[in-house]
């Protein structure tokens, strides 16, 4: 300790927190820049984490509980379940950074000390990210690792999609480089940008097709020997060079190619199973153009874009073309907007019937 003031803070910490050691007090105070209130809150946060994890351990495993060295970054850390972390980060428009710690792997225990405490990393994360930590031997830790199967990853809280992963030891400089594009745009801004890019790409493809047709002259068509052309291939002469075996696509094939180029829907989250709380889960019935019907449960808090992902995943390859979703309303209909920044509940389509129609 460097000063009488710091000794006073340690004494105050020990008076408030019963049965704690001087070493624990110093570690908590140092990690919070010698702010007494933050240090006490940090200790309570660690105790809550320990209590939650103790429920999943055998008595013989109690010695495996994490030590206070090094402590997690209180200003970045979210205290709660994974679902709560997704909801909180989505409402605050922050990326959710998930760190699954292991007591058996040394690098996992150095993140708080070497990575999260790095000044540049801390500043970057505080601006755009929320950090959620869990140990892999806990019930929630096992559930998350079985679903995502990795230890350090970045989650889009709106879609639940895993969009970036890290393995092993992570250096601050490389970590910041990986996060740059997520620092530049929040989750909602990222979705809006993706929707705009899809529209721009469609416009460019249409414009390119028009330019290709403008480039042909009457002389080009006069050069064709119609008697030698089959119904599905042509030889195009341009600038003195000939390109053989140029196959023209049918209308359905063109739409299929266009669709595969344009559609980049978010990855579907896992469907809620069993008896679900109707206050948090909704059921959507989808009617496809060929008469098929599919039903699927979603969390009411999940983004409506997942409905497009679900419909697209159930289309046959021959049906893989541009489509729109229409909500069946008595006496009217409502075409859904893919760019809507809303959940199923907010958009008013929870427990409704949706029809898929071709554009």
From Swiss-Prot:
Bilayer-spanning residue ranges = none
For this UniProt record, the keywords arranged alphabetically read as follows: Ubl conjugation pathway
One Gene Ontology cellular component term attached to this UniProt record is: nucleus
> Which pairs are disulfide-linked?
none
Start and end residues of each UBX domain: 277-357
InterPro entries, sorted: Thioredoxin-like_sf (IPR036249), UAS (IPR006577), Ubiquitin-like_domsf (IPR029071), UBX_dom (IPR001012), UBX_domain-protein (IPR050730)
The question of whether Magnesium is a record keyword is answered with: no
Q: Does the keyword Nucleus apply?
A: no
Q: Which GO terms describe its biological process?
A: proteasome-mediated ubiquitin-dependent protein catabolic process
Q: Which Gene3D superfamilies match?
A: Glutaredoxin, Phosphatidylinositol 3-kinase Catalytic Subunit, Chain A, domain 1
GO molecular function annotation:
ubiquitin binding
Any Pfam family hit: UBA_4
Name by which UniProt lists this protein: Putative plant UBX domain-containing protein 15
